[in-house]
């Protein structure tokens, strides 16, 4: 009981207009840490805390928040905590601290200074996970059309919303980026830290900005990699996705055409693309055998192709994947993991649709979508014609168009912020286009932008670059941003 009251006291300090005195006088609860690493040698520890479901009523219902910790490699020089987020929304981050030593492998000095903290954000993974009870094609993201075209996607979107309303209506009003940022500050407070450092990728940049907006005085060193655009509405972001992936599809086709001997897709880009499109069409008629009991449907292949178009250094995997399926052979052992990309999965004990359910609750909970179905139809037709790979999925309708709960608060804005953070982005990122980093840089004039002229989503530790790693490492160690923006050649 005492632990519950202490957490409430900390939560009250986060409510605008509430005096923080009670929280300052409270003693943070002692978390119970247990080993939870993926290997016996791992030093990763896990714990859980309770946070308010609704921060406007912090004495009301509480939910569980699962966190993890990789202790600082050099406790004597420990700087504080480095909270991490892999993106999403909907992504589990509990295991991410185990990967940070690889992401910052060239910067051991930075790694030595922090307890690296992971979290499953609210309603995700082991943090009071939500489910909509989705199955089959409902587990696909985005809303790919199939037989029945646009009308079928409308029906599917309505069915998804109906199921989410039946199973997760209790969570809908509280699944917001702002509340997740408040959870982040709860973690900081419970761990007894005066400030928070943060490493966030993709949607993690949105979380980082929300925290900066809500708690500017508690920001220490923030690294935001692959930045969403704070000036776009969610619908605008959907409509801007397809041209960037169309460009990546063209780059892949040209890549494959340069090595017809390995990939067998032809010696020119047009032929290479036609053969990939042909494979998807064949799978739409009859699933492609996979060597096990789970053949590849057209939806499976589209999903895998899309994920491998996120970064140009995945093109060789995509070429081999397509070549193997065209030959009706099982995937070789070294790329067998690609089969797992056909759909989002969940760890044991977590509902299989948790990623999709949480993604929708947060996306639809942050911002209202248009309700005009005919406008979605027009967008679908135009997107399908101009961007045939991803246009039909992203330009069409979203379940958010039928969401029963109107958003309670927007994502907090950093416009005019006096806080400086380190931004990282590639110029050709298809998922979080470079415009997002430039817009964030303008809104946060004290920040610095590190740019890499490649086509890659997620840079630090994902696209090897000594300049990026050195710049981020120096900032995490010293707290000093570069004097000016940094351009890092690949």
Predicted regions span which residues?
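Histidine-bearing beta->alpha loop at or near hydrolase active sites
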Residues: 453-460
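Alpha/beta-hydrolase fold active-site neighborhood
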Residues: 273-418, 464
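Conserved alpha/beta-hydrolase "acid-adjacent" motif
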Residues: 430-435
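Short beta-strand/loop motif that positions the catalytic acidic residue
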Residues: 417, 423-425
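Catalytic-loop region of hydrolases
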Residues: 2-7, 21-151, 181, 270-276, ...
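Alpha/beta-hydrolase fold nucleophile elbow
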Residues: 193-203
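A catalytic-pocket lid/entrance helix-loop region that shapes and gates access to the active site
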Residues: 132-142, 212-275, 320-344
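Conserved acidic catalytic loop of the alpha/beta-hydrolase fold
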Residues: 163-170, 181-195
């Amino acid at each position: 009981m005492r632990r519950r009251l202490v957490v409430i006291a900390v939560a009250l300090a986060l409510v605008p207009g509430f005096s923080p005195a009670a929280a300052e006088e409270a003693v943070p609860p002692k978390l119970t840490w247990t080993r939870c690493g993926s290997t016996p040698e791992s030093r990763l520890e896990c714990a859980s805390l309770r946070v308010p479901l609704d921060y406007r009523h912090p004495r009301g219902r509480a939910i569980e928040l699962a966190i993890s910790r990789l202790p600082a490699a050099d406790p004597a020089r420990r700087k504080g905590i480095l909270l991490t987020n892999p993106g999403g929304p909907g992504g589990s981050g509990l295991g991410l601290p185990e990967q940070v030593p690889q992401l910052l492998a060239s910067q051991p000095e930075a790694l030595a200074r922090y307890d690296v903290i992971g979290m499953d954000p609210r309603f995700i993974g082991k943090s009071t996970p939500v489910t909509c009870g989705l199955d089959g094609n409902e587990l696909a993201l985005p809303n790919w059309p199939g037989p029945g075209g646009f009308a079928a996607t409308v029906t599917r979107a309505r069915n998804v919303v109906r199921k989410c309303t039946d199973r997760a209506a209790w969570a809908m009003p509280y699944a917001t980026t702002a509340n997740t940022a408040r959870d982040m500050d709860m973690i900081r407070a419970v761990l007894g830290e005066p400030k928070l450092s943060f490493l966030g990728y993709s949607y993690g940049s949105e979380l980082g900005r929300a925290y900066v907006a809500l708690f500017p005085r508690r920001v220490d060193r923030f690294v935001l990699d692959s930045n969403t655009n704070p000036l776009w509405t969610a619908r605008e972001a959907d409509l801007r996705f397809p041209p960037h992936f169309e460009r990546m599809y063209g780059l892949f086709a040209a890549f494959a055409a340069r090595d017809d001997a390995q990939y067998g897709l032809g010696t020119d880009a047009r032929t290479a693309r036609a053969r990939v499109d042909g494979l998807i069409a064949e799978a739409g008629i009859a699933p492609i055998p996979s060597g096990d009991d789970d053949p590849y449907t057209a939806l499976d292949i589209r999903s895998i192709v899309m994920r491998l178009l996120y970064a140009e250094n995945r093109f060789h995997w995509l070429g081999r994947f397509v070549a193997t399926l065209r030959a009706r052979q099982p995937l070789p052992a070294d790329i067998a993991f690609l089969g797992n990309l056909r759909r989002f999965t969940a760890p044991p004990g977590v509902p299989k649709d948790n990623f999709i359910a949480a993604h929708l609750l947060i996306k639809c909970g942050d911002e209202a979508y248009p309700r005009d179905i005919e406008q979605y139809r027009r967008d679908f037709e135009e997107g399908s014609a101009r961007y045939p790979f991803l246009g039909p999925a992203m330009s069409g309708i979203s379940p958010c168009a039928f969401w029963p709960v109107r958003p309670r608060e927007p994502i907090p804005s950093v416009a005019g912020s006096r806080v400086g953070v380190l931004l990282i982005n590639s110029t050709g990122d298809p998922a979080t286009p470079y415009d997002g980093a430039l817009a964030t840089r303008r809104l946060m004039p004290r920040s610095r932008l590190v740019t890499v002229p490649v086509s890659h989503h997620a840079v630090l530790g994902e696209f090897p670059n000594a300049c990026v790693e050195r710049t981020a490492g120096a900032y995490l160690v010293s707290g000093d941003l570069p004097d000016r923006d940094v351009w890092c050649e690949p």
